[in-house]
From Swiss-Prot:
EC number: 3.2.2.5
Activity modulation notes: NAD(+) hydrolase activity is strongly stimulated by c-di-GMP, weakly by 3'3'-cGAMP, very weakly by c-di-AMP but not at all by 2'3'-cGAMP. Self-association of TIR domains is required for NADase activity.
BP terms from Gene Ontology: defense response to virus
Main enzyme class: hydrolase
Entry protein name: CD-NTase-associated protein 12
Domain of life where this protein originates: Bacteria
UniProt: 3',3'-c-di-GMP binding residues: F172, P237, D253
Family assignment from sequence similarity: In the C-terminal section; belongs to the bacterial STING family.
Domain remark from Swiss-Prot or TrEMBL: The N-terminal TIR domain mediates NAD(+) hydrolase (NADase) activity. The cyclic nucleotide binds in the C-terminal bacterial STING region. Upon binding to c-di-GMP the STING region closes around the ligand, which is bound by residues from 2 adjacent subunits. STING-STING interactions are the main drivers of filamentation; rearrangements in the STING domain allow reorganization of packing of the TIR domains, forming the NADase active site; cross-filament contacts strengthen the assembly.
InterPro entries the UniProt entry points to: CAP12/PCTIR_TIR_dom, Prok_STING
Length: 316
């Protein structure tokens, strides 16, 4: 699951928006405001209000579309609605996640001069059409480094999945990893001795199904045995595969706590229907991706977890 980027612009700036999408597409899931992902009867304003629940980052293209006169001086400026929409998006997601990509000739309001901006130059081609030069991609390369860093550092939003990932890590993963590391070698489970152990966290394919039942089916399909472990804080049931001839223990866990995300999304969208809208599916994928990213960051910061914990996708 890739990090998601929303790209907004005026109608005149759509070609620039498409180039931005092409640039980031190899490593990010990019969506233009013109893409068919929102309800037909929903305004762009409503779309932006929901954007914080659907996307990780937002780009707004400030193309020089209008003429503005300020104190008898004439300037080219972005459309008023684009400025408003950026301000709304910024208020929803914050400076670390909302970015301006502006044409060099576009006059930006003085209140926004402190905001980091990515600039690009334009020329008029042989057909008399104003187009962005290669300076766009050069500037986007610098922006990408900033986005990549934000993702790697884990600039977290106040999403349900962030809280759930932290709870799952502190309440199970961290304790289980500590128990596995401290008790190996010479670890005994069900009368078998193991010299090496690992914890594999199995991400469910989606939130569409009953995760508890999906977990039970996964454990059964892979012939996993059941046992209990006594950590310093509580007793946990586990499912494991044993390679007794090699002395290797593999513990598997599918985080059923993710069911809470599905319920939170249903409440957010005030679900009164059967099935999933595109917006619900986007929100679910976004939350799943964020859960996995936050959990991986927490694993990377813990010495015991780095030693034995791995996040995996379900195997058929």
């Amino acid at each position: 699951m890739k990090t998601r980027i929303f790209i907004g612009s005026s109608s005149e700036g759509i070609d620039v928006a498409k180039r931005i999408k092409t640039f980031f597409a190899p490593e990010y899931d990019c969506f233009l405001w013109t893409d068919d992902i929102f309800r037909n009867n929903e305004s762009f304003l409503e779309t932006l209000v929901k954007s914080a629940s659907l996307f990780d980052f937002g780009f707004m293209v400030f193309s020089a579309d209008d003429k503005t006169t300020i104190r008898d001086q004439h300037f080219e400026s972005p459309r008023d609605n684009v400025l408003f929409e950026y301000g709304l998006f910024l208020g929803r997601v914050g400076l670390d996640r909302a970015f301006v990509i502006a044409e060099t000739d576009a006059k930006i309001p003085t209140d926004m001069l402190g905001i980091t901006q990515t600039r690009y130059e334009t020329i008029v081609n042989s057909k008399g059409i104003k187009v962005a030069t290669d300076s766009l991609e050069s500037s986007l390369q610098k922006l990408k480094k900033q986005i990549d860093e934000n993702v790697q550092l884990g600039h977290l939003g106040l999403l349900p999945s962030t809280v759930i990932a932290i709870s799952y890590f502190e309440g199970f993963v961290k304790l289980a990893a500590e128990w596995l590391v401290e008790n190996t070698p010479e670890l005994m489970i069900n009368n078998h001795k193991f010299n090496k152990a690992s914890l594999k966290i199995v991400m469910p394919e989606s939130l569409d199904t009953d995760i508890k039942r999906s977990a039970m089916m996964y454990y059964k399909r892979h012939g996993l045995e059941e046992a209990r472990i006594d950590t310093k804080h509580r007793n946990y049931p586990i499912h494991f595969a044993s390679k007794t001839e090699d002395g290797i223990l593999e513990v598997y866990d599918m985080p059923t706590i993710l069911t809470g995300i599905d319920k939170a999304i249903d409440m957010y969208f005030r679900v009164g229907h059967i099935g999933k809208t595109n917006e619900q599916k986007l929100a679910e994928d976004h939350e799943m991706n964020n859960f996995k990213r936050v959990l991986q960051l927490l694993i990377n910061e813990d010495a015991f977890c780095r030693e034995c914990v791995e996040i995996i996708e379900p195997q058929p």
